[in-house]
């Protein structure tokens, strides 16, 4: 029986580290990034670069390429949400606050229900994989 996982990959440190762990623990890895109109595009670019590098070399800790699965990677566009979400982090929102992350500054950077939206989508993908394969499919979020 193969072990499957669907991971939400933002391109930040937490989800990138989680991806490496999933490569060690699972037979199939599906990584999904979300383009929701975020101003900080660098994380999406880093996620795509990381997947390309890992799929090219498929080497982690000096082991052979056969030791780790190829990453199935998708970017899901949620740009229809951009106009509906009130946050400094999305295109069209207020400026991202500078300086210390005081409580008032933090409020401006919250994207309402973002992680729940991501979790719902990766859960749906995992359920589809489980239905197709007849095997369990886990979800992983490095948030």
Language model regions located:
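ATP-dependent adenylation/nucleotidyltransferase module used to activate substrates
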Residues: 1-143
């Amino acid at each position: 029986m193969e072990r499957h996982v669907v991971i939400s990959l933002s391109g930040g440190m937490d989800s990138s580290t989680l991806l490496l762990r999933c490569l060690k623990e699972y037979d199939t890895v599906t990584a999904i990034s979300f383009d929701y109109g975020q101003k900080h595009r660098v994380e999406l670019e880093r996620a795509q670069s990381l997947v390309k590098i890992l799929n090219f070399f498929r080497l982690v800790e000096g082991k052979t390429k056969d030791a780790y699965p190829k990453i199935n990677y998708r970017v899901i566009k949620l740009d229809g949400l951009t106009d509906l979400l009130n946050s400094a982090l999305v295109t069209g929102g207020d400026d991202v606050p500078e300086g210390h992350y005081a409580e008032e500054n933090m409020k401006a950077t919250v994207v309402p229900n973002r992680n729940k939206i991501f979790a719902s989508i990766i859960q749906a993908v995992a359920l589809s994989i489980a239905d197709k394969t007849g095997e369990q499919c886990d979800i992983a979020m490095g948030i």
